[in-house]
């Protein structure tokens, strides 16, 4: 029996960081139950200097909106195409080109990271979730009280096995050649498509699926499956503060979560 979208229960929430900074929430999410489209994005921007230097222009927020709107529009227009993989890849490629146009209007000297976004973009077709992941967002599948982590580990592994040297990976796969983080992000460069990872999950009745930004990653990874099953996205976001590194209390990062119960 096929999983029908009208049997799917969906909850979601987003919360900006709790620090006294000028930076707004740069996460983005999209839930379209009717079309089976679910997206979580995490914006990346770093100004030279401190966030407290207000007013803070959220270039990553702007990029996230550009990317999200373009990806969603493309997927909606091509849902009847036979290959979800091709739909997703073409959607993010075209959206990334739009980021490139945005970036050309900005001075790259304004940021130590180029304005960009990363995340998990997914389509539910029948019993199967097809998804692309880029960066350090995370997916968790709970089945029979056991957890399967996907998304973040898949992307990190892909970067780790890259044959390029460390410095080459910085230049190719991150926003900025001098930055210490070396995962792919959608920053307008064509090379980002080399780091886009596609996969699929065959779903069972009773499965619970989480798509989240990295601010909740440790909580999803280390908490017991039964606790995740029973908690709302808001409760999970609240509880994730215990994993935030000192000296920050809750919400050291923007936190966004979509919970899908099949």
Task: Please name every model-derived segment.
Residues 1-262:
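PP2C/PPM-type serine/threonine phosphatase catalytic domain
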């Amino acid at each position: 029996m096929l999983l029908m979208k009208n049997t799917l229960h969906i909850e979601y929430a987003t919360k900006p960081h709790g620090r006294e900074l000028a930076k707004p929430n740069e996460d983005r999410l999209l839930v379209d139950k009717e079309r089976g489209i679910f997206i979580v994005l995490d914006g990346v921007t770093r100004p030279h200097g401190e966030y407290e230097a207000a007013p803070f222009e959220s270039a990553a927020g702007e990029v996230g909106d550009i990317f999200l709107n373009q990806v969603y529009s493309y997927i909606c227009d091509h849902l009847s195409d036979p290959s979800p993989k091709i739909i997703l890849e073409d959607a993010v490629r075209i959206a990334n080109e739009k980021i490139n146009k945005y970036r050309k209007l900005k001075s790259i000297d304004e940021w130590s990271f180029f304005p960009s976004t990363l995340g998990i973009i997914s389509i539910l077709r029948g019993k199967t979730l097809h998804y692309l992941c880029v960066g350090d967002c995370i997916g968790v599948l709970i089945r029979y009280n056991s957890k399967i982590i996907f998304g973040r580990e898949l992307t990190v592994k892909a970067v780790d096995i890259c044959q390029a040297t460390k410095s080459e990976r910085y230049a190719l796969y991150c926003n900025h050649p001098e930055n210490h983080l070396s995962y792919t992000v959608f920053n307008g460069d064509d090379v980002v498509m080399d780091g886009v990872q596609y996969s699929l999950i065959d779903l069972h009745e009773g499965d619970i699926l989480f798509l989240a930004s990295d601010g909740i990653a440790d909580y999803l990874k280390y908490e017991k499956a039964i606790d995740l099953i029973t908690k709302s996205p808001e409760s999970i976001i609240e509880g994730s503060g215990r994993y935030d590194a000192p000296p920050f209390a809750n919400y050291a990062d923007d936190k966004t979560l979509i919970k899908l119960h099949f």
